[in-house]
């Protein structure tokens, strides 16, 4: 578990939580700091023996960079934020290990027409990149349930036959097991303390 914003889980667990590092001595400005945060996350993911990794509150990568760079007048900061986040997704999608699954836990927001979408910052991510389109599987959570398919309100999507129901229990372990079985990836029995 890589936690962007908090150091603890909101429930009892033996899961090892790695808080995203925010102190990099070579970072001369906030742009360098945020690039270093993304590089750190990529190193943790690449070096981890764990087959299932969760990035909790991934939207805070965008939020923290926005606040860090709030006094910058240029729109370049929005380009940097979008490119940093998109590059992290591409890094994960290009991992050489087929059986390593990285989950993004991300908040959603309502659009003007009432549908739900991933919460983002800046026009580049909002208008040019459909964030959900970068992922094969998007599961929408509400009322302690996951929704596996869009219902004209969310952007949830899963391959046909992955789940028997549109509504499933909010159990990330069961989701991970189902994905591994569906794609023939084997179990995620590797435990690692980072």
Language-model segments: which ranges?
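P-loop NTPase motor core
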Residues: 52-130
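Conserved P-loop
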Residues: 1-54, 60
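Short, well-ordered beta-strand core segments
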Residues: 1, 102, 138-140
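Hydrophobic, Leu/Ile/Phe/Ala-enriched alpha-helical segments that form helix-helix packing faces
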Residues: 41-45, 92-96, 135
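Conserved GTP-binding G-domain of TRAFAC-class P-loop NTPases and closely related GTPase folds
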Residues: 109-194
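Short glycine/proline-enriched coil/turn segments at helix->beta-strand junctions
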Residues: 49, 97-99, 142-144
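Conserved, well-folded catalytic cores of nucleic-acid-processing
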Residues: 43, 61-64, 134, 138-141
């Amino acid at each position: 578990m890589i936690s962007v914003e908090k150091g603890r889980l909101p429930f009892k667990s033996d899961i090892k939580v790695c808080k995203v590092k925010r102190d990099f001595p070579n970072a001369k400005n906030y742009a360098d700091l945020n690039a270093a945060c993304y590089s750190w996350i990529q190193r943790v993911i690449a070096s981890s023996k764990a087959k299932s990794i969760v990035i909790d509150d991934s939207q805070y990568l965008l939020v923290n960079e926005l606040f860090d760079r709030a006094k910058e007048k240029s729109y370049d900061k929005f380009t940097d934020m979008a490119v940093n986040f998109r590059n992290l997704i591409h890094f994960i999608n290009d991992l050489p290990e087929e059986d390593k699954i990285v989950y993004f836990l991300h908040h959603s927001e309502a659009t003007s027409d009432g549908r739900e979408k991933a919460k983002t910052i800046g026009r580049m991510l909002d208008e040019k990149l459909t964030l959900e389109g970068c992922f094969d599987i998007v599961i929408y959570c509400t009322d302690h349930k996951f929704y596996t398919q869009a219902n004209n309100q969310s952007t949830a999507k899963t391959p046909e036959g992955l789940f028997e129901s549109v509504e499933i229990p909010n159990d990330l372990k069961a989701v991970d097991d189902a994905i591994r079985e569906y794609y023939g990836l084997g179990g995620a029995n590797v435990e690692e303390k980072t």
